[in-house]
């Protein structure tokens, strides 16, 4: 899986990049190698907003796009939450595809006989 980490209003240090790659390993194991993950980390500059550390993840799969966004006071916590949310979405998507595939009748069976 290809992982791209971007920063908006905050620098992306090698430590943050490693943390993102480590947290999204669970997602990488569930999807194909052709999948593309874009993680955008930003710091909102609004004094009225206490949850200024935002992590957004966009996962492009074959035929679909999954997106998750989390905002907290700590960037590390935001990364953890968005990784967990995206892992849940990938599992749900995979289970739905499997259920649809299994619900189809086999080719050798004719309905009504």
Give, region by region, the residue ranges found by the protein language model.
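N-terminal, polar/charged subdomain of small-to-medium soluble alpha/beta proteins
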Residues: 1-113
């Amino acid at each position: 899986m290809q992982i791209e980490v971007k920063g908006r209003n905050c620098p992306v240090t090698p430590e943050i990049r490693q943390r993102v790659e480590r947290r999204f390993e669970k997602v990488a194991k569930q999807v194909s190698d052709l999948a593309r993950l874009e993680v955008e980390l930003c710091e909102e500059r609004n004094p009225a907003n206490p949850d200024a550390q935002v992590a957004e993840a966009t996962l492009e799969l074959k035929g679909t796009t999954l997106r998750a966004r989390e905002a907290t006071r700590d960037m590390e916590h935001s990364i953890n939450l968005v990784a967990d949310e995206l892992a849940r979405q990938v599992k749900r998507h995979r289970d739905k595809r499997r259920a649809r595939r299994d619900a189809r009748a086999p080719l050798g069976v004719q309905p009504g006989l």
